[in-house]
Design a protein with these regions (language model features):
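Conserved beta-loop-alpha segment that forms the PLP phosphate-binding cup at the N-terminus of a helix
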Residues: 92-95, 99, 107-131, 246
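PLP-dependent enzyme catalytic core of the Aspartate aminotransferase-like
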Residues: 2-3, 337-338, 349-381
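Active-site phosphate-binding strand-loop segment of PLP-dependent enzymes
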Residues: 153, 158-214
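PLP-dependent aminotransferase class I/II
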Residues: 67-69, 90-93, 227-306, 310-313
Length: 381
């Protein structure tokens, strides 16, 4: 489907560029740069995998487990013999149908992705005049937009990181936010997110961690709004970071613009099989049970950290916690000496110094973390 050459912002309205939009775009471009020079590029490209290493107790990466469950590994292994052939269109159709059924959507409302990162990289194709990115949050969307020369306005939330639609510039025709939000673990009410909608604006919600919350409250994945685009990822819940699987849910016309110009066979056979397998009813039930365990582990982990005088941000809904200590970088390095990896917090726009992100883990791993913290001078209270 050819992209509309007259479409120069996310949701075309045909009213031209307003003076307010031009002014905001100029301010954002001056403040945050274009695709030519991005001084903080390395910070925006930093991810938790850079903070961990082989053999470490990993609190830095939010993937649940070290490998996919056995049944999923068997499903993928059964398709290895098919790798000598190009991906079958029937497999793509099956994957889209499975995702559509899982969320109560039509297959036309599903765009399969080679990981959530590919979805973020597609956003500049919508030609927004001014993008607003809500922070603190995952940094990949902002980087993708800025590298494409899209003016970006940062909407930085202050603790307790409550979303206020009034903070978003009215001129923004593209708004990107996470729910639940990485790294704050805040879950925004769906009604507040939909309050961001405006004529000519597209709202993109990164729900990469939504299935890590039992019942997926506040999710918009099953809602039909032509101006809301939802991004999902298989990486975290199913330990598939190395396979790169995800999908967009949204209006078919918007998905067509994102898909235009894409390379043929964007997903391979194993990726398509993984999408189909994890969208089935049994897999969804397993994911829900896992989310219940995460909630229990989180509830047990928070008081143990607080008993050491560590500030833990709440409310926390996701499979990770945002903590604050006097010298975060020193603590991160000292914990690494004890074989424990935690995620830097200073690379997230809007976070004050002293923040770290720690994945929610089970009792045995938390024991290791607490023991190391005590050895480093944190006293039980």
């Amino acid at each position: 489907v050819p992209e509309d050459p007259t479409a120069n912002h996310a949701v075309p309205t045909g009213d031209g560029t307003s003076p307010a939009a031009e002014a905001c775009a100029e301010v954002a471009a001056e403040r945050f740069g274009s695709g030519v020079e991005i001084p903080d590029r390395e910070l925006l490209r930093h991810h938790g995998d850079a903070d961990t290493g082989p053999g470490m107790v990993d609190f830095a990466v939010n993937v649940q487990g070290t490998a996919p469950p056995e049944w999923l590994r068997e499903r993928l292994a059964a398709r290895l013999a098919d790798l000598g052939r190009y991906p079958d269109p029937a497999d793509e159709q099956a994957a889209r149908a499975a995702v559509a059924a899982r969320h109560g959507r039509s297959a036309a409302e599903v765009l399969l992705l080679s990981g959530a990162a590919e979805g973020f990289a597609m956003l500049p194709r919508l030609r927004p005049r001014l993008a607003a990115v809500v922070h603190p949050s995952f940094t990949e969307p902002e980087l993708a937009l800025r590298e494409a020369g899209v003016p970006v306005a940062r909407v930085v939330l202050e603790p307790p990181y409550t979303l206020d639609p009034a903070l978003v510039p009215e001129a923004a025709d593209l708004v990107v936010l996470g729910n639940p939000t990485n790294p704050t673990s805040v879950l925004h009410p769906a009604a507040v997110i939909t309050a961001l909608r405006r004529p000519g604006r597209l709202v993109v919600v990164d729900e990469a961690f939504a299935d890590a919350i039992a019942g997926e409250p506040e999710s918009l994945a099953g809602e039909r709004h032509t101006d809301v685009l939802v991004l999902r990822s298989l990486t975290k819940t199913w330990a598939l970071a190395g396979l790169r699987c995800g999908y967009f849910l949204g209006d078919p016309a918007v998905l067509a613009r994102l898909d235009h110009g894409r390379a043929h066979w964007p997903l391979g056979t194993l990726q398509l099989e993984a999408v189909t397998a994890t969208a089935g009813p049994e897999a969804v039930a397993e994911s829900s049970a896992r989310a219940e365990r995460i909630a229990a582990d989180r509830a047990a982990m928070i008081p143990r950290l607080r008993s050491l005088g560590i500030e833990v941000h709440e409310p926390a809904a996701g499979p990770f916690l945002l903590i604050r200590v006097p010298d975060a970088e020193l603590l991160r390095k000292r914990l690494a000496e004890y074989g424990i990896a935690v995620r830097r917090g200073d690379t997230f726009p809007g976070l004050a110094s002293g923040h770290l992100r720690v994945a929610v883990r089970g009792a045995a791993e938390v024991d290791r973390l607490v023991e190391a913290l005590v050895q480093l001078g944190f006293e039980q209270r």
